[in-house]
Each structure stands twice: as structure tokens, then as C-alpha cells.
């Protein structure tokens, strides 16, 4: 069998309890087989088109850049069924689980978008679903908790640690260690032990493939910059992948700057982290001087993660992609501006990427084409944002 490379430069690997190694190897073997199986590829393609609603549009912002030289496009993953890019790879992994004879799906979720995607895929394909979600995230993402339960998923609040995404990941892995005979762990991002970072990327790369074709059709040239928010990093790798070999295209990942780097309340493992082992992989992460993983923080639950996928760590180290950050306040401003001027309410996660694009346009407006991956819609965030805007007298 052809094997996948478990490393991206020095990052990646499979640092898990021995008990999980056979399950990961089974997953790798099944994925490699599926990639050359016309039946699997046809079924996935049909689901992405007829059920999820691909291709998603590439929308030109008509008002945000009025009077500017820059053309700003949004890759509209917010229009995908389920409300975010998560659906792309969940359908792929759920089909793999069925091929392996698994009857149950275990998932972790932060903002609830991956949990919703897992729940909808399980409802569609007749699989049982249980989703681990930090208790703090359950509170700040109530609409998504209800959506998951409505579609038949069991949502399990996690009260350990900071009760956020990192803790949900740990609980999901723990569950899988005792149930891998019947269950598949449907990991939601390009992080974790091999082969997950590669599998998730391969199912998400359709975003960049479409975006490249669409921008070439509209403009006749490649974009100057492609920008995406980075938590674990799946939406960013999804849109970056097809442009990696195009050196003229700048790839920019935007981490959550939280309340400001100086406060320590942020989620920037690439820009302010160091190398270590966490969640089954060697990558960059936020650690204290004793090597303990520090708590991350972001207003957006989906970016509230103290590490990042190994391919992003590699892209940062080689300089192929640049990583910056946007604070909570900058993301909130972008959230408001896009809603007000274009009639599109973005997820708070995606608003981080938009915030950086708007900053670039403000300080360096020139003849350029920028694509922002609008990874999800903001319905899930309206209660959080409404509370803040009310306090600040914005609305």
C-alpha cells in the first residue's frame, strides 16, 4: 500500500497511545484506497454538489472597497450547507467511516460548526453521533448546540481545563481510545496525529481549487493575496493548498490576537508559540517555561486553540505563508462593517481574516486582488455580538 508522509518538514507525526496506532493505520489505508476508488469519489462529489451546495461563489465586495484600487473577493464557504467549510471534509470522513464498518462517530467542536457538520452527515448517512464540546463553548454557542441535538447528536459538555476546544479534543481522543472498534473519531481540523492533517486537507482543498478557477475566470490573473483565519487551520489550508506552488500569491494566515498580545489572552501559537508535542502531533503551540500547554483565548470559539496544524507550522518556518493576528476588537469591527456594507454576516472566526484584509487595504491601497476565505456565517455569533454591541452603544 502507498503510504502518506506523516511529516511536513519537521512537524507532524503520530504521538498517541499504542492502543490507537492500529486505528490510525486502518484509517490511512482506507483513505489511500478510497482516493483511487471511482465509486467513493463519485459519491463524495455528488454529496458535495447536491447536498452541500458546491461550488460556493466567489463574491466581489461592491461597497467595502468603494473608491479604492483594491478588489476584494470573498470565497463564500458561509453558503455551504451547515453554515461553514466544515461540511466539506465531514462528508468525506463519514463516508470513510462507513467503508470501515464503523457505526458511530465521535467529534470535538469549538464554535459548534464542526459538531453541526458531523451531526448532519451522521443524520444523512445513518450513523450515531456524539460530540464533545467545552462547557464554556456550549454557553457561547447555544444555537449550534440545539442544531446538533435536533439532528440526533448527543452533545457532551466538557468541564475540565478551560472548558474549551483543547479540552474537547482531549476528551474525544480519550473516548476513541476505548471505542475505536465501533467508532470513528471524525477530527475537525488539520491538526492531531497522522493521518488526520493530510486527510482533512485533501477533503478541504476543493475550496482553493474552486477559488483559483473562479478568480482566473473573473480576472484572468491569479490573486495577489489569499487570506484566511487560523485556529487549527483547516479552512486556511483548504484555500491555500492550490496556491502553494504559485510564488506570486501571498498566503496570509490570521491568528486570534484576543485582548492583545501583551495581555497573554490570545491564541497565537505560530507568531508567539514554540515547538512541542500536543494532541498527537509535533507542532507549534503556546507553552509556559515548563513546557506545559497554556490556555488560549479568543472571542471566537473556533479559533480558541493553543496549537496549530503541522502544515501551517511548516509553511511558517519555510516562509511560504505569513502569519499575523487580529484582535477581538478588530474582528468585531470587521464583523460589523461587512454586515452593514455588504449584507453578509460573517462568523467571528472569518471576521479575523477580513479584519486583516481591511487593514491592508487601508494602509496599502493599490491595484491588487485579495481573496478572503469567508469560512462560515455569523448566525451562531449574533447573541455574543449583540451583547457586546449593546454594552458599547453600537446598535
Curated annotation (Swiss-Prot):
Pfam families associated with the record? PALP (PF00291)
**Can you name a GO cellular component term?**
cytoplasm
Query: GO MF terms on file?
Result: tryptophan synthase activity
Q: Which residues carry this modification: N6-(pyridoxal phosphate)lysine?
A: 86
UniProt keyword list = Amino-acid biosynthesis, Aromatic amino acid biosynthesis, Lyase, Pyridoxal phosphate, Tryptophan biosynthesis
Catalyzed reactions: (1S,2R)-1-C-(indol-3-yl)glycerol 3-phosphate + L-serine = D-glyceraldehyde 3-phosphate + L-tryptophan + H2O
Q: Which InterPro entries match?
A: Trp_synth_b_CS, Trp_synth_beta, Trp_synth_beta/beta-like, TrpB-like_PALP, TrpB-like_PALP_sf
Which co-factor is required? pyridoxal 5'-phosphate
Q: Cross-referenced SUPFAM superfamilies, in alphabetical order?
A: Tryptophan synthase beta subunit-like PLP-dependent enzymes
Gene3D superfamilies listed in its UniProt record: 3.40.50.1100
State the pathway, as annotated in the record: Amino-acid biosynthesis; L-tryptophan biosynthesis; L-tryptophan from chorismate: step 5/5
Q: What is its EC number?
A: 4.2.1.20
Q: Subunit notes for this chain?
A: Tetramer of two alpha and two beta chains.
Which NCBIfam families does the record associate with it?
Answer: trpB
Q: Which family does it belong to?
A: Belongs to the TrpB family.
Function of the molecule: The beta subunit is responsible for the synthesis of L-tryptophan from indole and L-serine.
The name of this protein is Tryptophan synthase beta chain
Give the gene symbol: trpB
Amino acid at each position: 500500500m502507498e503510504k502518506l508522509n506523516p511529516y511536513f518538514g519537521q512537524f507532524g507525526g503520530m504521538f498517541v497511545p499504542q492502543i490507537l496506532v492500529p486505528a490510525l493505520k486502518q484509517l490511512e489505508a482506507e483513505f489511500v484506497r478510497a482516493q483511487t476508488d471511482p465509486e467513493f469519489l463519485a459519491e463524495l462529489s455528488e454529496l458535495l454538489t447536491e447536498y452541500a451546495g458546491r461550488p460556493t461563489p466567489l463574491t466581489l465586495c461592491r461597497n467595502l472597497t468603494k473608491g479604492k484600487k483594491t478588489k476584494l473577493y470573498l470565497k463564500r464557504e458561509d453558503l455551504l450547507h451547515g453554515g461553514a467549510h466544515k461540511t466539506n471534509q465531514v462528508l468525506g470522513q463519514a463516508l470513510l467511516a462507513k467503508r470501515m464498518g464503523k457505526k458511530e462517530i465521535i467529534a470535538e467542536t469549538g464554535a459548534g460548526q464542526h459538531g453541526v457538520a458531523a451531526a448532519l452527515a451522521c443524520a444523512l448517512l445513518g450513523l450515531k453521533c456524539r460530540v464533545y464540546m467545552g462547557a464554556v463553548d456550549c454557553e457561547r454557542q447555544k444555537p449550534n448546540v440545539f442544531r446538533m441535538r435536533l439532528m440526533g447528536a448527543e452533545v457532551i459538555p466538557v468541564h475540565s481545563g478551560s472548558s474549551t476546544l483543547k479540552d474537547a479534543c482531549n476528551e474525544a481522543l480519550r473516548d476513541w481510545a476505548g471505542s475505536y472498534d465501533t467508532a470513528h473519531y471524525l477530527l475537525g481540523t488539520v491538526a492531531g496525529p497522522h493521518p488526520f492533517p493530510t486527510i482533512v486537507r485533501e477533503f478541504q482543498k476543493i475550496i482553493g481549487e474552486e477559488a483559483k478557477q473562479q478568480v482566473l475566470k473573473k480576472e484572468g490573473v491569479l490573486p495577489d493575496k489569499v487570506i484566511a483565519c487560523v485556529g487549527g487551520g483547516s479552512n486556511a489550508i483548504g484555500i491555500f493548498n492550490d496556491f502553494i506552488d504559485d510564488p506570486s500569491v501571498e498566503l496570509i494566515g490570521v491568528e486570534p490576537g484576543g485582548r492583545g498580545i501583551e495581555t497573554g489572552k490570545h491564541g497565537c501559537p505560530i507568531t508567539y508559540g514554540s515547538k512541542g508535542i500536543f494532541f498527537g502531533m509535533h507542532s507549534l503551540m503556546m507553552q509556559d517555561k515548563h513546557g506545559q500547554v497554556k490556555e488560549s483565548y479568543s472571542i471566537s470559539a473556533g479559533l480558541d486553540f493553543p496549537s496549530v496544524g503541522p502544515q501551517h507550522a511548516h509553511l511558517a518556518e519555510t516562509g511560504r505563508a505569513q502569519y499575523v493576528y487580529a484582535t477581538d476588537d478588530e474582528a468585531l469591527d470587521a464583523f460589523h462593517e461587512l454586515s452593514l456594507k455588504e449584507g453578509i454576516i460573517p462568523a467571528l472566526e472569518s471576521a479575523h481574516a477580513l479584519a486583516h484584509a481591511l487593514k491592508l487595504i487601508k494602509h496599502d491601497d493599490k491595484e491588487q486582488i485579495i481573496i478572503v476565505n469567508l469560512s462560515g456565517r455569523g448566525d451562531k455569533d449574533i447573541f455574543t455580538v449583540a451583547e457586546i454591541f449593546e454594552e458599547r452603544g453600537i446598535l
